[in-house]
């Protein structure tokens, strides 16, 4: 599969996975791969605590105002990567601005009125954010929008919010907004989800459960699943170190690494059997800091793994 084709098969890619699986790092790598394939890319984060900017060497936190993380036009011919954070308050202010209520918008948001409304109509905060994503998709602001979704448990609730409001609100702009968000989420040409997991038993169990919930309850198409943090396969781990002073330590290290490889291989196979989706494999990075160099490394691995896949097929 061509990496450019993978990135261009939909307009919005929602990256979803359990907390701790490297979802934001995968988002950064995906954006870099898409940009190198010539697609202008907008990353949208919804929780504002991901540290996404630092992956591109940015020291300031992202805000509602769009910023450029990586300008295009470099030696590699990559397109630009931009990013922003979406919050319900800011989305509400902008919505009111656009509907002729500029004078009261900031006062309404700063008064905490949105929290009162959210209590009366659960899901309203999420629909404000998703409504803005829908607006960005319609505006053609970028070739690809990548949404760094909330952690898996909240992701399903987040994406289900439109269905809940559609059931609760019978008429008016909120219902119209909810229906338009559902139209976005259920159109594979406009929106798909890319799942992220680790090659471990519990994360694999959780990503399988999340996948079926997203398909059954939200009706969204799944682009594939990223298996993050794979150790490189080492050969000759059963070689005898002989009588070297470090022999016992070497045997123990080799046994640990072999057990790790066997476990990861087993979980990757189990995931493929439980979830028949394209798999993207990304390596474990032996570092605690992820910056531009690491993002480039993962983007190359991402592209290589995509290139090894067969031609795309939409899973709906």
Which ranges hold each PLM region?
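N-terminal phosphate/diphosphate-binding loop that engages ATP/GTP or pyrophosphate donors
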Residues: 32-110
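Short, surface-exposed amphipathic charged segments that create phosphate/polyanion-binding patches used
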Residues: 96-103, 237-242, 293-302
